[in-house]
Amino acid sequence: MALRRPMVAGNWKMNGNSALAEELFKKFATKLQNDSAEVVLCPPSIYLESVRQLLEANKQTLDGALVRMGAQNLSQHDFGAYTGEISGQMLKDSGCRYVIIGHSERRRMYGETSNIVAEKFAAAQKYGLTPILCVGESGPAREARRTFEVIAEELDIVIEKNGTMAFDNAIIAYEPLWAVGTGKSATPEQAQEVHAFIRSRLSEVSPFIGENIRILYGGSVTPSNAADIFAQPDVDGGLIGGASLNSSEFLSLCTIAMSA
């Protein structure tokens, strides 16, 4: 069985400020003492520099811990007249290692199709960023027993456009749309069932990737349910929304992941 290091990625969405980042790093210094889990902060782009400076300033106190920086989105284009967009090259230059791709809110609110998501996936890897690819089904799709079908389609378009080996440097986040921001989480058994399907699907085209890729769960994860979810054999941590804005809750989730 592969030894996959758990990851806890905090997606602040359009929330937070420099003070939140400073508060988190103060707690990181005393609570994160080893590298048994990887922690990723994904603040709004305007705060990336603040987080980068804090990473640099706390390098010694965080010695031994794995704290990285990620972005919430990027353009599929390299450069040009795309007002308000940020390229993969810019994110890499800012110090990002990761970038969230295809979050359900981007797909739903901003019309990002699976084709666009696949292009953004490629753009991230072109500049040495590791994409955190979000996949997941809506409530009606789950009720219609189409969960696996929807997720297979979202994975297959990325494979079709980028090749199977693109997942050798990628993270997948399963985020059931009916659980995102609703306070209603999937049960540990539901999460495991879908994560196992994702791993099996990728194993069909590459057993190595299927075994080694990290798959996060995202959808109303809290300190009260994280231990049971993270304990599932195919769950490798979480993509955290609301709880990432509370430094105590987020640190609790990191600690839980370290012992999962």
From Swiss-Prot:
What PANTHER family does this protein's entry cite? TRIOSEPHOSPHATE ISOMERASE (PTHR21139:SF42)
- Main localization category: cytoplasm
Per its UniProt record, what CDD domains does this chain match?
A: TIM
- Positions contributing to substrate binding: 11-13, 181, 220, 241-242
Xref: InterPro entries: Aldolase_TIM (IPR013785), TIM_sf (IPR035990), TrioseP_Isoase_bac/euk (IPR022896), Triosephosphate_isomerase (IPR000652), Triosephosphate_isomerase_AS (IPR020861)
Family under the similarity heading: Belongs to the triosephosphate isomerase family.
Q: Which reaction does it catalyse?
A: D-glyceraldehyde 3-phosphate = dihydroxyacetone phosphate
The UniProt keywords, alphabetically, are:
Cytoplasm, Gluconeogenesis, Glycolysis, Isomerase
Q: Does the keyword rRNA-binding apply?
A: no
Question: Known Gene3D superfamilies for this protein?
Answer: Aldolase class I (3.20.20.70)
State its role: Involved in the gluconeogenesis. Catalyzes stereospecifically the conversion of dihydroxyacetone phosphate (DHAP) to D-glyceraldehyde-3-phosphate (G3P).
Which portions of this protein are annotated as coiled-coil regions?
none
This one is known as: Triosephosphate isomerase
- Which residues are the active-site ones? 103 (electrophile), 175 (proton acceptor)
Q: Where in the cell is it found?
A: Cytoplasm
Instruction: Name the enzyme's class.
Output: isomerase
GO molecular function: any one?
Answer: triose-phosphate isomerase activity
Question: Is the keyword Cytoplasm assigned to this protein?
Answer: yes
The biological pathway it contributes to is: Carbohydrate biosynthesis; gluconeogenesis; Carbohydrate degradation; glycolysis; D-glyceraldehyde 3-phosphate from glycerone phosphate: step 1/1
Return the EC number: 5.3.1.1
Quaternary context: Homodimer.
A GO BP term here is: glycolytic process
Q: Pfam families of this UniProt entry? A: TIM
Write out the GO cellular component annotations: cytosol
